[in-house]
């Protein structure tokens, strides 16, 4: 992942709440209830981030989640309307296989992974969720997979070759 932090105030970010759960802490006097929110933010132009927030009230949890997501933004390369190459993201028990698709295919992905890909700015991409359907693990696996993406120019530079040599 990139070391430099991305300034969220420069971007026009859209946010999407993926998951809200009521969580419980059992104490001597009974149970303490709080709400946990999983939020994805993105500018639909190559920037996407995920965050989680927890609070006594749902709106506060969502607000905290948005703040957290803005701190965890990553930049993803978009080639045309799709991903540059196939990749697998892993987080916990969640595996997400992200594959390029032809123009006009649309976003073929299930549940929270679809939201991540939409907010990242992809128009044509296929994804398969494997291992778990826990929203947090799926979203983080998708972010992990997207953070591994590299353009052909970057790969060529790392290998010390020209793009023509790389692509044959």
From Swiss-Prot:
It holds the Pfam family Ribosomal_S5. InterPro entries: Ribosomal_Su5_D2-typ_SF (IPR020568), Ribosomal_uS5 (IPR000851), Ribosomal_uS5_bac-type (IPR005712), Ribosomal_uS5_C (IPR005324), Ribosomal_uS5_N (IPR013810), Ribosomal_uS5_N_CS (IPR018192), Ribsml_uS5_D2-typ_fold_subgr (IPR014721). Keywords: Ribonucleoprotein, Ribosomal protein, RNA-binding, rRNA-binding. GO terms for cellular component: small ribosomal subunit. It comes from the Bacteria. GO terms for molecular function: rRNA binding; structural constituent of ribosome. GO terms for biological process: translation. Residues 13-76 form the S5 DRBM domain. Belongs to the universal ribosomal protein uS5 family. Part of the 30S ribosomal subunit. Contacts proteins S4 and S8. With S4 and S12 plays an important role in translational accuracy. Located at the back of the 30S subunit body where it stabilizes the conformation of the head with respect to the body. The N-terminal domain interacts with the head of the 30S subunit; the C-terminal domain interacts with the body and contacts protein S4. The interaction surface between S4 and S5 is involved in control of translational fidelity. This is Small ribosomal subunit protein uS5. The lineage of its organism: Bacteria, Bacillati, Bacillota, Clostridia, Peptostreptococcales.
């Amino acid at each position: 992942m990139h070391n430099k932090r991305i300034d969220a105030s420069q971007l026009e970010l859209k946010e999407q709440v993926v998951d809200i759960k009521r969580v419980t802490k059992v104490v001597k006097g009974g149970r303490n209830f709080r709400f946990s929110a999983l939020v994805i933010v993105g500018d639909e132009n190559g920037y996407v981030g995920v965050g989680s927030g927890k609070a006594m009230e749902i709106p506060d949890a969502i607000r905290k989640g948005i703040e957290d997501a803005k701190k965890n933004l990553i930049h993803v390369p978009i080639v045309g309307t799709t991903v540059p190459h196939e990749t697998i993201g892993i987080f916990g028990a969640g595996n997400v296989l992200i594959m390029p698709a032809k123009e006009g295919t649309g976003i073929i992905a299930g549940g929270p992974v679809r939201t991540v890909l939409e907010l990242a700015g992809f128009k044509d991409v296929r994804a398969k969720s494997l291992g778990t359907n826990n929203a947090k693990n799926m979203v983080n696996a998708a972010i992990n997979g997207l953070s591994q993406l590299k353009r052909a120019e970057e790969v060529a530079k790392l290998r010390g070759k020209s793009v023509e040599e790389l692509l044959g």
